[in-house]
Amino acid sequence: MSLVEISGSDAMAAPMPGRVPPPPPRPPPMPRRLPPMFDAFDHTGAGMVWGFPRPAKKRASLKPLHWVKITSDLQGSLWDELQRRHGDSQTAIELDISELETLFFVEAKPEKIRLHDLRRASYRVFNVINLSMPLPDMMTAVLAMDESVVDVDQIEKLIKFCPTNEEMELLKTYTGDKAALGKYEQYLLELMKVPRLEAKLRVFSFKTQFGTKITELKERLNVVTSACEENLLLIHQVRSSEKLKEIMKKIPCLGNTSNQGPDRGKTFLSPVEFKLDRLSVKRMHYFCKLKEIMKKIPCLGNTSKSNPRVGVKLDSSVSDTHTVKSMHYYCKVLASEASELLDVYKDLQSLESASKIQVKSLAQNIQAIIKRLEKLKQELTASETDGPASEVFCNVCWFFVRLMI
């Protein structure tokens, strides 16, 4: 066999004739290192985020540790140094989860029992929370009818949010733990401690506003008294006005002319046989309108004489259109036939004051006060049988009644 010259690495790799080649060397072992404390970096411009080792799955809710992420330049900071040392082996802190759960366990709140509609309950509880004091203290002030503590607006709000009969019945039939009930149910239970709360609140509201109502009523009564004196004077003026008598005497002429016809029957009247049913919506209103129209008569008269420059648009504010037309036409006739009667309103100087009397409205206000006094009497009678729960309320009521008398 001829020898072949082999050089370099090939000479080392070539097996010697007649020998088995040695096995290849084992690969080097993988480096063994513990998981680092900071094992991930996220470079985001000026700041960076380092990921902590994922903790074991929590078995209970723990109180959170709140921190704020740093977004400014970290160069030269402690966090920058930790980043540069990232290649060093870092050992994660081993935490005792059981101890953490013992120290920082968040106790789950017991679920409240709701017996009523959640939307209605939330709205009412929100308004009650906005009251100026705790509800028990306010109920104490209500029973004492203390106006220095509870104002009329708060009273009206409490009246609005008084429990209904259905709500009270639902709570009365509940046999479970009342401490486990929701806020709205607790609110209702507090209100239900006061017997007939709504009736007492209405008495309290009446007491609060009584002084103002009586003052306003006295002022209106004085106006009525003065107006009645004016009314008596007006009656004298009406009876003594010769011009008004002449006007009234001429009205049947218009009516008899309008009532002519084969199917109307005998409707002719003498000057003293008619009432102002068509020429007035209300008697006082008629006289007031008559006064206004009389002042406009010259314009109406000029219009009838075809002088459009001084014409006037007729007033149509009265609900009865036919009445307005009849009245205006009659005034127009007076302007043409008896112009000396046009200043009749000068004989009725008390007309305007007397027309402002609102006896019906005044009577309604007086009647409303009488009804509320009757309600006060009923609640006072019922409260006297409540015992200690309404004792303070009864004492204040009796004191208020004595002041009114």
Swiss-Prot record:
Domain of life: Eukaryota
Region (Disordered): 1-31
Compositional bias annotation for Pro residues: 18-31
Domain FH2, chain residue ranges per copy: 52-405
A Pfam cross-reference name: FH2
Signal peptide interval: none
SUPFAM superfamilies per record: Formin homology 2 domain (FH2 domain)
Family: Belongs to the formin-like family. Class-II subfamily.
Family matches, as PANTHER family: FORMIN-J, FORMIN-LIKE PROTEIN 15A-RELATED
Protein name: Formin-like protein 15a
Record organism: Arabidopsis thaliana
